[in-house]
Amino acid sequence: MRAFRKHFHLWLFCLASCANAVCAAAQSAKSPGQTEWDKTIERARKEGRVVVSITTSNDLRAAIEKHFERKYGIDVEPVIGRAAVVLRKMVDEYKSGVRYFDLHIGGSESAVNSLLPEGLLDPVEPTMMLPEVKDPKHWWGGHIWTDNAKRFIYSSLAHQSESLWYNTQLLNPQEVRSFDDLLLDKWKGKIGLLDPRTPGSGASLWSYLLDIKGEEYLRKLVGQQMLIGRDQRLLAENLAKGKLALVMGLGYYSHAPFKKAGLPVLALPTPKEGTYISGGSGHLVVMKQPANPNAMRVFVNWFLSKEGQDVYSRALGQGTRRLDVDTHWLREIGVIAAKDSVSVEQYYRLENQSENKINTAREAGAALARKLLE
């Protein structure tokens, strides 16, 4: 009996030793990066929240709550509004010593003109922790940056713009196969345009038309008595209710509530002159000295991950550059991801959101818009 107990205790000792060895091996098998990621999540949960400036979209807010907040246990405090207003607030608060915002995701022009010159941004790449995020092989075109320094404004999306939408009861898409068709008398007073004097897709389309059609064309277009506004919802509502036949410069998410409600709005097939490639609302910047540095890092890595890009792309109807995220479904809403339609070389020729393009083509377009519209 004593011998049995002796062997039994020896067996238990060996079993415990093996278990400890397995645990130690499992712990050592964790890469340093994974260990640091776990610690970052733990610290982020203690911070409790991340403050993100994002585009106005109820679908996006709901998707972030469903996927990010439940996954990581970190609250997201979204700040929404017109980019020019929100970014001005970010600059003013930062200069006064207030550290409230952690990061901003939106269009490129506001970031280039408002945040970049003020020196308020930290490089994005050091915040990329997950291998699936920082390895360029997961991204069509590799890592693409908006700013000339290729450090501060990361471009996660690239798609051919869906910025022409029409009311199916007032316009047959075959009637507008060229931008020249918009100059016909029948469309006078029936066209809406997102104000090209302010940063956004209205300015993007306007500068593209200046490039391919020239100043005289834009003079004639202005003569069509267009409804020009900065309220995207109001423009989309006027289209859905039949007050306008066509609206220029609004993306899918502006029209989505009306489309989902069964109102007669659709994206217009691309005119024969083609269209520019947009980075949409997918430009990411991180603030210097963020209030919640760990929560910021967790959000950045989730946003740039396969899951985050799929969620963001579907909520806004814009095409991600991630190669492992399906974007073919976007064609159903009149959007084509750049990775599904053009080469990387063509992208650099057609894109219009880089700092260089903003300082040349967009600045010229904005100056002409102010001249013709004021």
Per-region residue spans from a language model:
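Mature extracytoplasmic/periplasmic domains
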Residues: G282-R349
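Extracytoplasmic ligand-binding site segments that recognize negatively charged/polar headgroups
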Residues: V51-E65, E77-V91, R99-A236, A240
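Periplasmic-binding protein-like
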Residues: L218-V222, L227-G229, G262-P290, R331-G334
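Conserved C-terminal helix/tail region of periplasmic/extracytoplasmic solute-binding proteins
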Residues: G33, S341-E374
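Short, polar/charged alpha-helical segment
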Residues: Q34-R45, V51, T55-D75, P257
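Short, low-complexity disordered leader/linker segments with a strong preference
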Residues: M1-E47, E374
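Paired acidic/hydrophobic, glycine-rich loop segments that form the ligand-binding mouth/hinge
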Residues: G97-G106, A245-G251, L266-A267
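A ligand-binding cleft/hinge motif common to bilobed small-molecule-binding domains
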Residues: A111-S114, L246-L266
